[in-house]
């Protein structure tokens, strides 16, 4: 090859390499410039929410609580339309205050009537009826709002005329209406069955009782009207049903059922009614009579069952129905309300219902709440491991913090954390059981003044809910944290006065009477400061109430006062948290036995399962106030105990049954 040709090739290769290098460098500079510009822009970057389609925006807004949805209505026309649809889609017509959680949003898909917490029952109901009137006016004046309502739940005690008015509007103009819940007025039957939209769209069937209370005179036209209503409404489209009569009686004597009902959600009320027996003499169903519930309801479709007993005993027919439900193995949600426990029947029932995901049990004995029998509890542990929601009463043979033995109070401490020690030393012993005679019981006044935990339940400090995660939690009587503290201080003051334990008031003493503190407490570290709401309705957390706060102190005279500081909101919250700590071993049993558990309402205290550091623990839903759990490390302790037991006795491995029995 001539040298000149060789040189030209080398020169061309060099130029190509150089051009490529320059191009790479230029590209790198461009990339760096882009990154710098993007970083600069990202500092002020806001996600363009308005660019989302309406369907996605509705999904985003569905996770907002009611006050935020109301604010969205004021932004612009587009957001107003989306938020309005969410606001009115599902309405809960309550007649008492709904309690909000200070820890999480609960049942936010319901729109509620905003009612104060401290009003008397009659006053609260009057305000609820006034708000219901305004809602009716809104629906009458705005057809677009009426057309988005899908589900409405009515409280029994609201004005019956107003109930009929709103149902008439919805049944005739609510083209989206699908479900009516808690319809208890028989006069509404014709409104629903003849409504322009409800007669074809509503998939729920609520049989209204003859009267608000059982064992009253049944109107003569009740059964004929019910028979007519059944003939108009019973169809294969029904998915939700509420009955006040035994289904076998209903469909053998009053309506000749010819197909199995594919009901998803069934609610049965068991109560005594004095119907005219003439209607239940001759069967009108052709062919063989219905003999068991699986001939009425399709076993494959029934998922939710609620039984509410109004009786103090289980009747023979009611026990037969419980046995019938053993066949419904696809049940996922079971609620047994105000029922007397029958251990053998219920143990047998739970052994068959292995697919349960939700369970609520409220047992009564002579109209007094009764803890779940250990045998029933054990059968649930063994058979229902898929449970995600549990609501029951169970003490696991652990005595209460304030226990009564014969005529004397006893204090039982299960948890020795710093806060629990302060509760026992500074609050229970320092304020409530300050003197030796305080431990003796003479009358009910002693319990009202000193058993703070019983009074939390008696005065309804904690709200009631059908299911705290799915339905609003309502107060069953006027009460909030401020009122509760005031009431307890008044009870304590009256008790101290009756025992001549009040002391002369010291004027201008900024410290008043210091709380009695044990020697051991003096060396303990200070508890975590609890931030407590000072608002009457306990809606917002906005103030720190110091332990010595006397904003709720009661007085009985200008010259005498308590020999100790008054109870404070902080005291009540600390006692409430100590109550949860007290049953640590039971909470651990639930965590061990139910790996899918999300909500637990144990002894009327609602808690939610949270995961921290790869460990599941319970946190209280109400009055959380930076609650400090005593469950941390339970899984490691459990594994260690299981290993030790296995090493000690290889032929006797630990089981859930043994754990429950020991507990």
From Swiss-Prot:
It comes from the Eukaryota. One of its GO terms (biological process) is protein ubiquitination. Residues 46-91 form the F-box domain. Gene3D superfamilies: 1.20.1280.50. GO terms for cellular component: SCF ubiquitin ligase complex. Pathway: Protein modification; protein ubiquitination. Pfam families: F-box-like. Coiled coil: none annotated. Keywords: Ubl conjugation pathway. GO terms for molecular function: protein-macromolecule adaptor activity. Substrate recognition component of a SCF (SKP1-CUL1-F-box protein) E3 ubiquitin-protein ligase complex which mediates the ubiquitination and subsequent proteasomal degradation of target proteins. Probably recognizes and binds to phosphorylated target proteins. Present with 195 molecules/cell in log phase SD medium. Interacts with SKP1. Component of the probable SCF(DAS1) complex containing CDC53, SKP1, RBX1 and DAS1. This is F-box protein DAS1. It comes from Saccharomyces cerevisiae (strain ATCC 204508 / S288c) (Baker's yeast).
